[in-house]
Amino acid sequence: MQPLELVKALAAILDSKKAEDLTAIHTTEQTIISDYFLIATGTSSTHVKALADELEYEMKRQYGVLPKGIEGRATGWILLDYGTVLVHIFQREQRDYYNLERLWEDAEKIEL
């Protein structure tokens, strides 16, 4: 699966589970870490965990794709590493605090 196809598939799953403020950032020119960041907000800690769980489950079920790693399950910020796409799922307070969009403001925003 190409990186842009992957980010759109991930975003569609998160959107179907009522993730808020979905933002995709093309980071290829800014970092070697990944090609894209996908940022989403959950309405509560339970919602954040449910979004991460459903994303992992649906990506495996629909595409046979598993994350290379998952961090932060016990916090308000869960990171799922899909190689070319890093998915950040935040609670509102953590998203506002870390403000990844500002940190990567020079990167291209992708229409979802």
Regions from the PLM with identified roles:
Residues M1-I33, S45-I78, Y82-V85, R92-Q94, ...:
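Polybasic/polar functional segments that serve as interface/processing modules
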Residues I39-G42:
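Short hydrophobic/aromatic beta-strand micro-patches
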Residues D35-F37:
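Catalytic metal-binding acidic patch
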